Amino acid sequence: MPSGEGRTTPMTMPTTDDRRRTAEPIDLDRLTLAAVREGALEGRPVTVLGLARSGLALARFFSAVGARVTVYDRRPAEELRQAIEALAGRAIAFRLGPGVDPVTTWRRAALVATSPSIQPAFPTAEPRLRAALADLVRRRAAGDPTAPPLVSELDLFLRLCPAPTVGVTGTKGKTTTAALSAAILAADPSHRVFLGGNIGRPLVDELLELRPEDRVVVEISELQLPTLSRGTTVAVYTNVTADHLDRHGTVEAYRRVKRRLAELVDPRGALVLNAEDPVTAALAGLGGAPTVMYRRSLPIPGGVGVVDDWIVAAGVAPLPLVGGGTAGLGPGGRILPVGELRLPGAHNLSNALAAVAVGLLFGLAPDAIRRAAAGFAGVEHRLEVVAVVDGVRFVNDSQGTQPDAVAAALRAFEPPIVLIAGGRDKGVDLAPLGPIVADRAVAAVLIGESAPQLETLFRSAGLERVERAPDLATAVRRADAIARAAREGTTAPEATVLLSPAAASFDMFVDYADRGRAFKAAVVEIARERGVRVSAAGASKPDAAPTLPAGAAPTDGAGGEVGER
């Protein structure tokens, strides 16, 4: 295997005439999946930038269709051993290490494909690569006939996908909404459903197997949106609040990025928007597609809402392009009682409303939607109830990395609550979090780099008990002891230990999923010591087939924690 800067795997070298013929830039606007299946990319030189999750998928795809693939990553081979081994046996050249000039990897390429965090405008790519990509973009814009096109993994997928797609974006709630939407669509056995994107599964892996009658649900992050030139059939927005300001600089810039999916939506499709979020609601009318609004109160005509504790629809018609119709709704447009949802918290009710709208747009019968929604238990690392041990409920919300998400998690459970928080600061305003923590939590146990900042914030808001712990396992034990003591002498049936960090994970963990697994392992150890049996994978996992396997972490590229909400 490669071991050092610039080392490559053996390849059959093309002739000079072959190079001239195959290095002509690929016309992406004319490329179709049918043409790819018939050999349109065979022998064409393609450069893949980045060897993380999306880069691996791109390398597999282009190799499978006969392209001559070169992979560039600034990290040395020793750090990429697992990824390189995953591509063993394929005719792929590796150009690895900080000494490799990225420009040399695409000088004779017909196409350059990238992971989401490798793009000219974002600081997540290293400066030399960012400058080289910016120059490539300028050459393309100037009409340079030798400049290869630049395409992201997700944009390539959306360009070639033959099936209707549902794109889900927003600041928080994306993963739950996407997974529940997929579970609802899967209730119709006549269509296969694929779930991927930022949720952890690069969908380009599925391209060659897709058929027009399939359904695809894509979670789309703010890293992926700027790379898109094609939209989805249906675009779903959960909410848009301040986040990732370390990448975008201002709230306004972040909001401009988030508009992208609405601007690109298929005009024959639909926009599904949260009427209770003013930024999201203002997107109505973009892209020329009709809008379906949802809210946790009386539904807007043509939308989804709640009446008398029932989720109801007010005239949501199925999309003509997906074929078929929908069964008649019950009295008052009833679909299912709110109480049948297994997802805790008002924010999860909003997520469910959006997913119900998706089901209706694709012609699902209300009883099928009801069964799927009522059977959906949630997504790993998002308000995941791991276990209840001696009257203490342990909740893994490792993906709660910003104040709004933590506040929603605190409101989802009854007191007493002990909050575990801390990690690497994301550069967002944490001040609004202080009052809700002081109001809802009896104590906080803090870890990581942001612990001092959070301690000052929580104490100044009036929270009397704030402790620091050197690591997460210690924090879980301290929080457990505090929670058990807080429950004594009260009528509360359970106390809750809630991991909802209000911070990224990179100071102590690989990513938020690694942090969540560490939390669950600590809970399992406490349970074992007390003779309580609990699975290390936790108790709250999706029941539906199209969800991810446990441990699939939506991270990619050059250090961007894409999946953290």
Task: Please give the residue ranges for each predicted region.
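Beta-strand->loop->alpha-helix junctions that form or flank phosphate-binding loops
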Residues: 70-75, 95-99, 149-156, 194-196, ...
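N-terminal leader/targeting and accessory segments in enzymes
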Residues: 2-152, 344, 538-542, 546
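Phosphate-binding loop of NTP-binding sites
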Residues: 102-109, 116, 120-275, 279-290, ...
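Nucleotide phosphate-binding/pyrophosphate-handling subdomain across enzymes
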Residues: 29-45, 58-65, 332-441, 456-459
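Residue-level signal for inorganic ion chemistry
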Residues: 62, 112, 168, 198, ...
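Active-site beta-alpha connecting loops in nucleotide-dependent enzymes
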Residues: 41-60, 70-82, 379, 398-472, ...
